Amino acid sequence: MGYIITKTVSIVLISFLFTIIHYLVIIIIQSTTKSEKIDGDRFLNNIWFYLIFFLFFGLFLLLITLIVEKPAVIFTLGIFLILIVPFIQPFIPMIPNIGDDIQDSFKYIPFTYLTEKMTGEIKFSHWQWFISIASIVVLFIANMLYASKRDI
């Protein structure tokens, strides 16, 4: 159980590190282009977004790592989820009869809306907040149970 808690804490620290790097890049770009300052609310939104993004994908891939134990599968799945899914998503409505329904359901699947928000506006609906946090809790519990079952 200590292994999973340590991994989760490291994921949280990495998310804070990425937030700080992201914010520093924004400050450097703002100072070189003499644009308006970024407000503090946007910075706080970025902290929450990166925390949710890294915890969700980190805990999901950690669970897959515990189950599969093959690094190539985890690497391929990570690339697929973060790079390929957003590329394929605009083509889903072209599927006859069910494409629009699938596209509507993407608003409630963290794999799709978290990667979509990486390149767009970081605004969550109430359901997306709930689904994200609930998914993180479920993934954390699943990791704990699987790790205790394997005696890690």
Q: Which sequence ranges carry the predicted segments?
A:
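Secretory targeting signals
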Residues: I4-A72, G78, P86, L114-S132
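Short cytosolic juxtamembrane segments of multi-pass membrane proteins
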Residues: A147-I152
